[in-house]
Amino acid sequence: RDVVSKAESFITEEVTSVEDALQGARDIIAEWINEDMIVRGIVRQQFERHAMVKTKVAFGKEEDKEAQKFRDYFDWEEPLKNCPSHRLLAMRRGEEEGFLYFHIAPDDEDIQEILHHRVIKGNNAAAEQVAIALKDAYKRLIKFSIEFEFRNISKEKADKEAIEVFVKNLRQ
């Protein structure tokens, strides 16, 4: 049976339309995709290889006197793997003080294309619904979860490097 016919069979008092039924199915599929360790591994690998550190000045803070110590990072982007610990820590401080927006992420379109080839099997109406769920799973669930992991990992690494530099300087 086609997708619409199948969705019609789920219409109830709570699920009042085909679109509601399809959205419910997509939400369930998005959760399955989010919990798939292979999918999460692919996203993690893309973060490891291609994540960019991106900072922007927080809205309304461009002219703030206190924010000027972070002005180098008002519009900054560089590969996470190349970002020195002192710079990463400065950006994080700018975020904590409310002057910067700080994100770590690879190119969304690249990841979504890789995931599409991995997850979508076929070219029909059902595959189209899975593709919509996949995009939602990445944008709403997976991306922020993996970014949170990489924020923590990069912070721990930067803290460790900063301590090593401090100890080295004490010994000199």
Please annotate each region the language model reported.
Residues 1-172:
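Duplex nucleic acid-engaging cores and interfaces of nucleic-acid transaction enzymes
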